[in-house]
Amino acid sequence: MVRVPFVTAVTTVFSYGVIFGFGHLRDWFRALLRSLFSGHSPAAAGTNLKGYAPICGGQEDFYYRRFVRRVQDCFWRPIASKPDAWFDVVERYSNDSNKTLHRTTKTSRCLNLGSYNYLGFAAADEYCTPRVIESLKKYSASTCSVRVDGGNTKLHVELEELVARFVGKPAAILFGMGYVTNSAIIPALIGKGGLIISDSLNHNSIVNGARGSGASVQVFQHNNPAHLEEVLREQIAGGQPRTHRRWKKIIVIVEGIYSMEGELCKLPEIVAVCKKYKAYTYLDEAHSIGAVGKTGRGVCELLGVDPADVDIMMGTFTKSFGSCGGYIAASKEIIDHLKHICPAHIYATSMSPPAVQQVISAIEVILGEDGSDRGAKKLAQIRENSNFFRSELEKMGFEVLGDNDSPVMPIMLYNPAKMPAFSRECLRQKVAIVTVSFPATPLLLARARICISASHSREDLIKGLEVISKVGDLVGIKYLPVEHEKTTSAEKLKKIQ
C-alpha cells in the first residue's frame, strides 16, 4: 500500500483545492453573466435546445472541463507508426487553452515506454507477419458474423485449442475485446444469490462486470490473503442479505499483475484460502500471460501454482501477443456453458481472422514451435530489461511500485501539476510516457506508468533512464534517497552501458 508523505499529501490536496475552487468560482460567474445578459438560464449542456435536460453535466463534466481539458494534450496522442520500441508521435497544437487540439504534419520519433508491447510482437515479425498477411488474403479482415452463425473459422477453433494447451486448462473461448471478456463473462458466471469477492484494485472491467451481474459484491484489501479470509468467513457465516440463506456460489477475483501497481498477485496464498472455503478462483492474466514465467505461461508458472487449482483463467491478446481480443480458459463444462449463454459470444462479431492468426503465430514462437529459440530469448530479454530498469529507477530516488519480473512499473508523481509537466517534458526529449491520475487512480496517487518491452535494447533503456532522471530532477519527483556516489548519473549510466 502506498504511503503518501505528509507534505506531499498536503500540497497535493491544496493543488486540487485550487483547481476545484477556482473552477466552481468561474462556473458561478459564467452562469451569473449569462443570466444577466440573456435573461434566462443557459441551454442544457451538450445540446442547443432550451428546455432539455443536460446530457453532459454533474461532477464528471466539471472534472473534465476544469482539469482533464487543461492536460488533455498528455492523452489521446496520435501515433503514425507501429508501436515498437520507437514510434512516431504526431505533433499537435492548441490556440484555445487545450479546448481543441489540432494535428500537424510533423512527427517526433520517440522512445516508446507506454505501449503494452511486452514481447515485441506488435512490430513486423519474420514468422508472424507473413502468416497474418496470408490469413488476410484467405479470410478477409472480418468474418462479418458471430461465432454461432458464419463467423466460426478454422483459425478460431485452432486458437481456442492452442490457448487451452498453452495455459494448461481443458478448454477455452475467445472474445473480440479484452475489456468485454471480463465485463460480459462475470455476469454469465454468477448472478443474484451469488457472492463476488474482489480485490480492491481490480480493473474497471472487473468492477463493471461484478456490478452488472446482480450478485452481492464485497471487496478485500489489495493483495491481502489474510483479509480475504476474514471477508470469506464473515460472509459465509452471515449468508445472503435479509434471508441469511447460503450463498449459491462464491467467486474470488484477482489479477495476475495489477496494471496500475505493477504488483504480482499473491496467488499461492489466495488459492489456498479459496480452496479452504470452497470458493471459485477467477484469475485475470491480462498483463501477465506471455510476459512472466519461464515459458511465458503467466503467474501460475512464475509462482508455482498448478493451473488446475485456478478455476477460471482470463487473459487478453493485446499485450504480449500483439493482437486484440481476450479469452477465458476453464473446464470444458464451464466453457460449454459460456458458449450457450454469454451474450458477448452469441451476439458479437467474432475476432478478426488476421488478429486470430497473429496470436496463433505469437504463441508458436513463444513455445518454440516455429523451429527457433526466439521465444525463449524474448522471455529472457523482457525479464532482464524489466529488472534492470526498475533497479536503476530505484537507485535514482524514484518511488517505483511493483515487483521484480513485472514489466509494469509505476513512478509516483502525486501532485496533479507534476503529471502534465513530467509528461510534456519527457515527450519534448523524445521519450513517450503514459501518465495516469484520478479517476483511474485514487485522487492523491497520480503516477507515470512505464511498460517495458523485450524489443527495447540496453541503449534504449539507458536513453529512457537519462531522460527520466533529468525530468525527475526538474519536476521534483525523486521522493526517496538517491544512492550516494561520486559519479554523476550520466557517468554511471555510461558505465552500465
Swiss-Prot record:
GO terms for cellular component: endoplasmic reticulum membrane; serine palmitoyltransferase complex. Pfam families: Aminotran_1_2. The modification N6-(pyridoxal phosphate)lysine is found at residue 319. GO terms for molecular function: pyridoxal phosphate binding; serine C-palmitoyltransferase activity. The chain crosses the membrane at residues 4-24. The keyword Acyltransferase applies. It catalyses: L-serine + hexadecanoyl-CoA + H(+) = 3-oxosphinganine + CO2 + CoA. Its cofactor is pyridoxal 5'-phosphate. It is a single-pass membrane protein. It is found in: Endoplasmic reticulum membrane. Disulfide bonds: none annotated. Its EC number is 2.3.1.50. Pathway: Lipid metabolism; sphingolipid metabolism. The keyword Protease does not apply. Coiled coil: none annotated. One of its GO terms (biological process) is sphingosine biosynthetic process. Keywords: Acyltransferase, Endoplasmic reticulum, Lipid metabolism, Membrane, Pyridoxal phosphate, Sphingolipid metabolism, Transferase, Transmembrane, Transmembrane helix. Serine palmitoyltransferase (SPT). The heterodimer formed with LCB1 constitutes the catalytic core. Belongs to the class-II pyridoxal-phosphate-dependent aminotransferase family. Heterodimer with LCB1. Component of the serine palmitoyltransferase (SPT) complex, composed of LCB1 and LCB2. This is Long chain base biosynthesis protein 2c. It comes from Oryza sativa subsp. japonica. The lineage of its organism: Eukaryota, Viridiplantae, Streptophyta, Embryophyta, Tracheophyta.
